[in-house]
Amino acid sequence: QIPKAKYEALSTKLKAQNPMMKLLSIQVGRPQLVMRNGEPVSTSIYKQPIESRVMLRTLNLDGDRQADLRVHGGPTKAVYVYPSEHYAFWRKEFPEMDLPYGMFGENFTVSGFSETTLNIGDEFRVGSAIVMVTEPRMPCYKLGIRFGRTDIIKRFLVSERSGFYLAVLKEGEVGAGDEFLLIKRNEPSVTVND
């Protein structure tokens, strides 16, 4: 915990850069088989929105599972977060596609966050949980399956709109509409995009 005065100053600074840090939508999914080049592939990238509050656990949200634990999930990748602001960019890139929240396989679609202003190690309270920013997303070929196009992975990387992963420091209940409250700013540090 940081002293209240310092917390308020840091929170004010971060909010000035990111005015309203809010959880807009929660998506969960379980492994399912899809075809890729004539072969079955297990993936959990097809996330569905949930309306109710849900428990955020050390390894994932209740109702969410990762398909390949060698590269997805674990304590440092419990939740994948994607800023809603990026959807406007992708809708211009792919005007013919329907791009609902969760299209990138994210668990949390958020507003007011940017990979350029968040530091690795920043900690937030959301709902009754405490989470920490851990790393940017490096997409695998399953993003190409979801989009039905192989060029999305390169375009995703070049766009610098990666989203980021969270570790869960304290389990708790979360729901759409919850605000992210900064409780620890990791400075000096590197941003998610560094």
Predicted segments with their positions:
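Short beta-strand-turn/beta-hairpin segments enriched in glycine/proline and small hydrophobics
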Residues: 146-158
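Conserved SET/PR domain catalytic loop and adjacent active-site segment
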Residues: 171-176, 182-184, 189-190
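Electropositive, beta-rich accessory/interaction domains or terminal extensions
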Residues: 18-143, 151, 187-194
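Short beta-strand His + acidic residue motifs that chelate non-heme Fe in jelly-roll/DSBH
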Residues: 133, 166-167
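Loop/turn positions that initiate beta-strands
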Residues: 121, 176-177
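Arg/Gly-rich low-complexity intrinsically disordered repeat tracts
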Residues: 1-19
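Short, structured beta-strand/loop micro-motifs enriched in basic residues and often containing a Trp
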Residues: 104-113, 156-166
